[in-house]
Design a protein with these regions (language model features):
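Flexible, glycine-rich phosphate/dinucleotide-binding loops
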Residues: 22, 112, 131
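Intrinsically disordered, low-complexity boundary segments flanking structured domains
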Residues: 1-5, 110-111, 142-148
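Short, well-ordered secondary-structure micro-motifs
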Residues: 26, 109, 133-136
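Catalytic metal-binding/acid-base residues of hydrolase active sites
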Residues: 71-73, 102, 128
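Active-site metal-binding motif and surrounding structural segment of the metallo-beta-lactamase
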Residues: 76-123
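Nucleotide phosphate-binding site architecture
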Residues: 14, 104, 130
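Conserved beta-strand hairpin/beta-sheet module of binuclear metal-dependent hydrolase folds
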Residues: 2-85
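Metallo-beta-lactamase
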Residues: 88, 121-164
Length: 164
């Protein structure tokens, strides 16, 4: 079985990549030390920079194809190509679940205004929706308007309430 696939009972989990930028690990983990990172050389590109994986997860279960997060999109990003390479038809995605509404989680919803997952329902956390669609927040980041708002406008979004 390929390394990017794990089966748990009847559920198939497929690891998907969008990008593997090389940058300082302190961007995401500011309270760590270089000594701590050096204990994991497989995560380090060189003595100062680490691999910072952007990815998603596809889940096949009970006849459904679920995508957890849609990556970043942009320069160097390749989620749609990785899906194709791993045999996942983006038009077959039934449900997209967002863990949260950050650019590396909602970036491939649309390309040039066209949906990349045209047959999917999108599950969006209520708290994130409420926060990012407030008038004072909506234009503070460039991805909400082109990648998240059209989900509601096109009637393909369901809000999820509570903790998960």
């Amino acid at each position: 079985m390929p390394k990017h696939i794990v089966n748990v009972g009847d559920v198939e989990l497929i690891s998907l990549n969008d990008n593997l930028p090389i940058r300082s690990p302190f961007v995401a983990f500011p309270h760590t030390t270089i000594e701590q990172w050096n204990e994991y050389p497989e995560l380090m590109a060189d003595h100062e920079n680490g691999y910072h994986r952007w990815g998603s997860l596809a889940i096949r279960s009970s006849g459904k194809l679920i995508l957890v997060d849609t990556g970043m999109q942009g320069e160097g990003c390749y989620l749609l190509d990785d899906m194709k390479r791993k045999g996942i038809d983006r038009e077959a995605v039934d449900i997209v679940v967002f863990t949260h509404v950050h650019p590396d989680h909602v970036g491939w919803n649309y390309t040039d205004g066209k949906p990349n997952f045209p047959n999917a329902r999108f599950l969006v956390p209520q708290k994130d929706w409420d926060y990012w669609t407030k008038p004072e927040n909506i234009n503070t980041v460039e991805y909400v308007v082109p990648q998240v708002l059209p989900l509601k406008e096109n009637g393909v979004m369901d809000l999820i309430d509570g903790e998960y």
